[in-house]
């Protein structure tokens, strides 16, 4: 039983490695893979293309199994055997397994789409020496935007932390002031003269502590007032918004994101056109190869026909030479008998 499974798998592996399988399957993938991307959402066109792929593979496999004499049950058993799910064989049998597994089919088509795009980019770069602008600068714009956003977020978090620390410092100073105020009132009721001097010290200390706080608060006065009533997350968002407004890049970021979308669309359209041209050239070269093969076959046939005609003419010449030889011999014999 195991030997039968190995024999069936060996036959299928040999078939999927040959041109009868690879040529139509690769041609189908190259023509249909342009609509596939790596997004999680599956489009309706994916299902239609998958059904077309099923029909193609089933037709090719059925022809091979009938020629070799393998039944459908034997083929199913071989595909479900543990040997078929090994890492090496699974990679080779991926186009066959993609008939029943849509995830494998989609991953295979996405990979082929990426390969064609990279191939088109290499051809463009080899032909022109450099890449067009629509393929060259789009990623730099995105990275610059990401760096600006990260700087703004870091700045907002830093300012939020400083504001939180200042708020804690103000609360501690306020509590200390209230405690000392109560203590001074108790001292005043007992008629102590040291209390005013003692109370002036923390008040003065509080003023001295407030001075650097006010200097730090001045660039972000409005946001600092609001942050007193906000949580840490809300404070970070407020600082981010304020930092964007003060840097004057809020509108530019929005514009750049739109420009980036247009740039990506141009890039995708450009690659699509180049890929279509590449596929058209492949089809044209394939037709030229087929035509040349047909011409060679016709030339070979004509040579064979000429050879047959030459053989016939040689046979006629031989017969004629034999007749002439016989006539010469007869004439010689007659002349000898006459003498």
Swiss-Prot record:
Feature: compositional bias, Polar residues: 187-200
Entry-linked InterPro entries: BART_dom, BART_sf, CFAP36
Keyword annotations: Cell projection, Cilium, Coiled coil, Cytoplasm, Flagellum, Nucleus
Principal localisation: nucleus
Biased composition (Basic and acidic residues): 281-313
Protein origin, superkingdom: Eukaryota
One GO cellular component, as annotated: cytoplasm
Residues forming coiled coils: 142-188, 255-330
Compartments, as annotated in UniProt: Nucleus; Cytoplasm; Cell projection, Cilium, Flagellum
Annotated region described as Disordered, given as residue ranges: 177-212, 281-318
PANTHER family: CILIA- AND FLAGELLA-ASSOCIATED PROTEIN 36 (PTHR21532:SF0), PHOSPHODIESTERASE HL (PTHR21532)
Similarity section: Belongs to the CFAP36 family.
Protein name, per record: Cilia- and flagella-associated protein 36
Organism for this UniProt entry: Xenopus tropicalis
């Amino acid at each position: 039983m195991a030997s039968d499974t190995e024999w069936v798998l060996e036959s299928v592996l040999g078939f999927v490695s040959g041109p009868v399988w690879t040529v139509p399957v690769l041609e189908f993938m190259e023509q249909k893979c342009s609509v596939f991307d790596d997004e999680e959402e599956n489009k309706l066109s994916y299902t239609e293309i998958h059904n077309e792929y099923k029909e193609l593979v089933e037709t090719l496999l059925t022809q091979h199994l009938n020629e070799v004499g393998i039944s459908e049950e034997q083929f199913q058993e071989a595909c479900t055997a543990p040997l078929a799910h090994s890492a090496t064989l699974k990679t080779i049998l991926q186009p066959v397994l993609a008939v029943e597994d849509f995830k494998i089919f989609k991953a295979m088509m996405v990979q082929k789409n990426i390969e064609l795009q990279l191939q088109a980019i290499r051809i463009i770069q080899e032909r022109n020496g450099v890449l067009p602008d629509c393929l060259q600068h789009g990623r730099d714009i995105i990275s610059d935007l990401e760096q600006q956003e990260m700087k703004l977020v870091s700045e907002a978090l830093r300012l939020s932390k400083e504001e939180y620390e200042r708020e804690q410092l103000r609360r501690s100073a306020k509590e200390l002031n209230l405690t000392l105020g109560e203590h001074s009132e108790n001292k005043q009721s007992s008629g102590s003269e040291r209390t005013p001097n003692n109370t002036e010290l923390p008040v003065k200390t509080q003023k001295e502590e407030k001075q650097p706080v006010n200097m730090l608060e001045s660039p972000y006065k409005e946001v600092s007032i609001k942050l007193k009533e906000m949580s840490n997350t809300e404070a970070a968002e407020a600082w981010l918004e304020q930092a964007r407004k003060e840097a004057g890049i809020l509108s530019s970021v929005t514009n750049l994101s739109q420009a980036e979308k247009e740039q990506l669309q141009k890039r995708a359209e450009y690659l699509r056109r180049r890929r279509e041209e590449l596929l058209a050239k492949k089809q044209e070269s394939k037709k030229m190869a087929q035509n040349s093969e047909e011409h060679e076959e016709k030339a070979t046939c004509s040579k064979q026909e000429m050879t047959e005609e030459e053989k016939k003419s040689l046979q006629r010449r031989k017969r004629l030479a034999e007749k002439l030889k016989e006539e010469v011999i007869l004439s010689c014999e007659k002349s000898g008998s006459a003498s």
